[in-house]
């Protein structure tokens, strides 16, 4: 089209001014395509703003729209590229809240880029004045888009093959205190936990490189601890070496050094470091045969408020695409937020290949992962031996159960604390395999095992009164 033709068309087809979003972006007769990215938003409009207008504003501002009509709309095909609110449903018990379902054409997004998806869908609209609050509850990625991602570096089955460990959850421990230990004392704590029976130990999320413990020194002492523990136990062991760094270049430098030390797994804080850094590291991990543990530090800033932010199930789906072999998910029974149905909903979205819509668990869309490798769920935070039956029953085998204080707080030390957890785990797995009901008989299983394990008996006595009974905020 020539410039002259454009001028002629604008004179006849362009009308300047402001018009309601719903005239263009609210399309209740639209049927979503298999290739659309679908989003479910919990919308709280300002008083006096109609639901249809608020929903259409979200669709517009997260896709092609702006606050006024622009003549350059005539230079593109808005019907092809615009986001569409195709359905609105009320939120039970809330008079001024609703769920808006929005479809986005796939051509709006760069292939293989979670960074671009989030920049588009949640990058600007959350500050829109017409809305009191906005929360992205769920997102459906089409198979056509999933196929542009590598996903987890290895996945659950490959990890089990690397570790030669099958038929049970894996056991881990976060080294405490999280800050302040010298590299040598840190390595000592790692060794004691691993020789006591754990599969993994872990850097805490804020352990990077500090004056009291530089990253290279920590890596060296941890590598020595793992070598010694493996020689004594005959089992493959690992420690999540946190390679999160100020720059991507430094992050990859630390990852390379872990590989030189023949370490099987490294760790990354994916939200604070960002999705671009995480995808870069995940691709490096696949190319170099290293497992990748993901910590979700900062997630509660984004997902804890029920009316505003992004639900963790969206962050979990984004992580599966960006890449990670493990990710923290909460425990249901420990000190961190997490209602069982909601938690297991996003755990299924991490591990399973196909998950049906189930709004009772917060799953607004059926998700087909097109054989993308799964991510192992990590239960961590305020758990101890009395929680073991519930953890095994809730999370199943494809999980990592991480006891930080529940290992290091044992009166006899780190190794006995690790042994207590290993005995409790083995007892629960055996009882489950024999057909016993862990939900009903779990405490009996632990008591029976404690009769022949003094380490477990001491742990049971120490933590018999410890409970974290608070009402969950994360509900449908």
UniProtKB/Swiss-Prot annotation:
The catalytic site is made up of: 176 (proton acceptor), 295 (proton acceptor)
Enzyme nomenclature, EC number: 4.1.1.39
Q: Where is this site: Transition state stabilizer?
A: 335
On induction, the UniProt comment says: Part of the rbcL-rbcS operon, transcribed in light and constitutively during growth on fructose.
**Which reaction does this chain catalyze?**
2 (2R)-3-phosphoglycerate + 2 H(+) = D-ribulose 1,5-bisphosphate + CO2 + H2O; D-ribulose 1,5-bisphosphate + O2 = 2-phosphoglycolate + (2R)-3-phosphoglycerate + 2 H(+)
Listed GO cellular component terms?
carboxysome
Keyword Transmembrane helix listed? The answer is no
The record's annotation in InterPro entries points to:
RuBisCO, RuBisCo_large_chain_AS, RuBisCO_lsu_C, RuBisCO_lsu_C_sf, RuBisCO_lsu_fd_N, RuBisCO_lsu_N_sf, RuBisCO_lsuI
Where substrate is bound, by residue? 124, 174, 178, 296, 328, 380
Query: Which cofactors does it use?
Result: Mg(2+)
At the top of the EC hierarchy, this enzyme's class is lyase
Co-factor: note:
Binds 1 Mg(2+) ion per subunit.
PROSITE patterns for this protein: RUBISCO_LARGE
A GO MF annotation of the entry reads: magnesium ion binding
Q: Known post-translational modifications?
A: The disulfide bond which can form in the large chain dimeric partners within the hexadecamer appears to be associated with oxidative stress and protein turnover.
Residues holding Mg(2+) = 202, 204-205
The record's function comment reads: RuBisCO catalyzes two reactions: the carboxylation of D-ribulose 1,5-bisphosphate, the primary event in carbon dioxide fixation, as well as the oxidative fragmentation of the pentose substrate in the photorespiration process. Both reactions occur simultaneously and in competition at the same active site.
Q: What else is known?
A: RuBisCO folding and assembly commences when the nascent large subunit folds with the help of chaperonin GroEL-GroES. Both RbcX and Raf1 help folded RbcL release from the chaperonin and dimerize; dimeric Raf1 binds to RbcL(2) leading to an RbcL8-Raf1(8) complex. RbcS displaces Raf1, resulting in holoenzyme formation.
Q: How does it assemble?
A: Heterohexadecamer of 8 large chains and 8 small chains; disulfide-linked. The disulfide link is formed within the large subunit homodimers. Forms complexes of many stoichiometries with Raf1 with and without RbcS. RuBisCO interacts with the C-terminus of CcmM.
The protein in question is named: Ribulose bisphosphate carboxylase large chain
Source organism of this protein record? Nostoc sp. (strain PCC 7120 / SAG 25.82 / UTEX 2576)
